[in-house]
Amino acid sequence: MVKDILAPGLRVVFCGINPGLSSANTGFPFAHPANRFWKVIHLAGFTDRQLKPEEAEKLLDFRCGVTKLVDRPTVQATEVKLHELRSGGRNLIEKIEDYQPAALAVLGKQAFEQGFSQRGIAWGKQKIAIGATMVWVLPNPSGLNRIKTEKLVEAYRELDQALIMRGL
């Protein structure tokens, strides 16, 4: 099982869709070697070095956290059922209300739309918020996602810069 890495006072909580099999086997988030999460958050400015999946707890040192919409591991996120995403969205709102990070970054547009019953959303900052927490939708860093790493970094850096502009 891949546990959440959460604490009060975080700049951002990154929310993946669900654990892949590599993460489920190791217990660490974003553990598959092809997953670009750790590289992208470093290059975007969230960490001062590229962490390894087994160093996930160190995210807290950078005021970052990690959670997921669905606990059940799958080979591909497309295997996650709509009812799981909807339930996960409700659970995620409760977590965010409890921890109150400055921002929530949901990693995947379709997962966000299904988990939060939204339609036709754009990438980036959303109109909805959870209390004082800004909600962002960023591209998923999975190696199965064809988006180029440079575009991922650009999208994640936009969030980092928005937080810096708010003094966070």
From Swiss-Prot:
Keyword DNA repair: yes
SUPFAM superfamilies attached to this UniProt entry: Uracil-DNA glycosylase-like
EC nos: 3.2.2.28
GO biological process, alphabetically ordered: base-excision repair, AP site formation
Predominant location: cytoplasm
Keywords recorded for this protein, A-Z: Cytoplasm, DNA damage, DNA excision, DNA repair, DNA-binding, Hydrolase
Gene Ontology, cellular component aspect: cytoplasm
Gene Ontology MF term list: DNA binding; pyrimidine-specific mismatch base pair DNA N-glycosylase activity; uracil DNA N-glycosylase activity
Alphabetical list of HAMAP family matching this protein: MUG (MF_01956)
PANTHER family: G/T AND G/U MISMATCH-SPECIFIC DNA GLYCOSYLASE, G_T MISMATCH-SPECIFIC THYMINE DNA GLYCOSYLASE
Record family assignment: Belongs to the uracil-DNA glycosylase (UDG) superfamily. TDG/mug family.
Purpose: Excises ethenocytosine and uracil, which can arise by alkylation or deamination of cytosine, respectively, from the corresponding mispairs with guanine in ds-DNA. It is capable of hydrolyzing the carbon-nitrogen bond between the sugar-phosphate backbone of the DNA and the mispaired base. The complementary strand guanine functions in substrate recognition. Required for DNA damage lesion repair in stationary-phase cells.
Record's subunit section: Binds DNA as a monomer.
UniProt-recorded name of the protein: G/U mismatch-specific DNA glycosylase
Provenance organism: Salmonella arizonae (strain ATCC BAA-731 / CDC346-86 / RSK2980)
Biological classification of the source: Bacteria, Pseudomonadati, Pseudomonadota, Gammaproteobacteria, Enterobacterales
Gene name of the record: mug
